[in-house]
């Protein structure tokens, strides 16, 4: 209280882990109008009463308003950073009050504020383009409903952390990808409902994204990460700990070593790529895909009709093309439609089919360089075409 009375020009206040009351914090709202940063994380006694109450006669266009029998409360026009980590007593009402009196906050840390709901996130959305960074990790009650609103209103967010928000789905990540063109970092640790659809949608931000945290998102596959690292050339950090598909030795060799203080279990599931590891992983995945693409045998695919030799590209119908299956699942999603071009070389299905076709023709004595036109005009090729039909029918 003495600090609030005598140090009215404080620019930063850090009371993290202090046994400070809500009454003391409320004094800063009444007197510390020049404060730019406030850190009161892990202050277990702080509740909604720490923040000035809104009234009906309040107007955001005014710099102050009067409350009956209380000192004048002024708007914190210069307040840019608020950290309320683990303030478990605050509710949606506290967030409403903060946003009302500090309408230009850029960085808001609300991790582990377990009582917050979608209502709080919708209040945060009112910050609009002023908001650059938002931490909502372990705020387990929030859903797609509020995150979609946030994504559409706060379009200048550079960093968002949604770790351990179990109710979120692909819908939230798709909206974030579509509406946050400046996004550089995203935390999705243990957001278990997201799938490859979310990962592919993040490729829309290929010019900006630098750090992605996806640990323990067990529905994510290697195919999706292949697309991600191929598209995101600025990516410098990718965490995939706890995802079964990435425990393979051929992928683990590109991971950085786990911290020494980790337990045996943590070391076993640790999978984080950074710096040169990202570059090497990208090269490995591209080379591995090309190798598999070259080694596909026609026995793995069922032939379709020859169509009188006029259809060069539809001799085969893929039955186990993972990349094509991924495209079909994403394209059929009611909330997302992605063009083939988003996948680069990964989904160049025609090349794969043409390669299989040529290998089959070669095995049956027909030149792999023959075009459909040549096949129709050359009698020897016509004979071999009949041999193909015989091969299928025997």
Residue ranges, per PLM feature:
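Conserved nucleotide-sugar donor-binding catalytic segment
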Residues: 14
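C-terminal capping region of solenoid repeat domains
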Residues: 6, 23, 27, 31, ...
């Amino acid at each position: 209280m003495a600090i609030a009375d005598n140090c009215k020009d404080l620019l930063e206040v850090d009371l993290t882990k202090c046994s400070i009351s809500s009454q003391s914090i409320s004094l800063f709202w009444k007197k510390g109008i020049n404060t730019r940063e406030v850190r009161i994380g892990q202050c277990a006694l702080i509740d909604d009463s720490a923040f000035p109450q809104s009234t009906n006669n309040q107007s955001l266009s005014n710099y102050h308003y009067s409350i009956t029998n209380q000192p004048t409360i002024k708007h914190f026009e210069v307040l840019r950073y608020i950290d309320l980590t683990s303030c478990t007593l605050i509710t949606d009402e506290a967030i409403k009050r903060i946003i009302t009196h500090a309408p230009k906050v850029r960085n808001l840390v609300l991790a582990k504020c377990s009582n917050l709901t979608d209502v709080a996130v919708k209040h945060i959305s009112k910050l609009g383009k002023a908001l650059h960074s938002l931490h909502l990790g372990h705020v387990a009650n929030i859903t797609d409903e509020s995150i979609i609103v946030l994504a559409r209103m706060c379009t200048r967010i550079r960093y968002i952390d949604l770790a351990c928000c179990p109710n979120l789905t692909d819908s939230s990540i798709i909206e974030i990808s579509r509406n946050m063109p400046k996004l550089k970092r995203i935390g999705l640790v243990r957001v278990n409902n997201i799938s490859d659809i979310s990962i592919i949608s993040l490729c829309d931000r290929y010019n900006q994204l630098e750090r992605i945290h996806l640990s323990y998102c067990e529905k994510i596959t290697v195919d999706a990460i292949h697309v991600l690292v191929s598209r995101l050339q600025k990516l410098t950090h990718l965490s995939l700990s706890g995802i079964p598909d990435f425990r393979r030795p051929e992928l683990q060799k590109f991971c950085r070593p786990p911290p020494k203080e980790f337990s045996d279990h943590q070391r076993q599931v640790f999978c984080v790529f950074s710096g040169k590891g990202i570059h090497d992983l990208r090269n490995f995945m591209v080379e591995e895909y090309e190798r598999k693409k070259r080694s596909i045998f026609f026995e793995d695919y069922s032939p379709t009709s020859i169509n009188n030799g006029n259809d060069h590209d539809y001799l085969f119908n893929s039955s186990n093309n993972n990349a094509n299956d991924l495209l079909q699942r994403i394209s059929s999603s009611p909330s997302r439609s992605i063009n083939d071009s988003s996948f680069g070389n990964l989904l160049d299905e025609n090349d794969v089919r043409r390669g299989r076709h040529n290998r089959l023709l070669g095995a049956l004595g027909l030149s792999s360089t023959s075009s459909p036109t040549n096949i129709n005009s050359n009698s020897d090729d016509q004979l071999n075409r009949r041999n193909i039909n015989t091969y299928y029918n025997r």
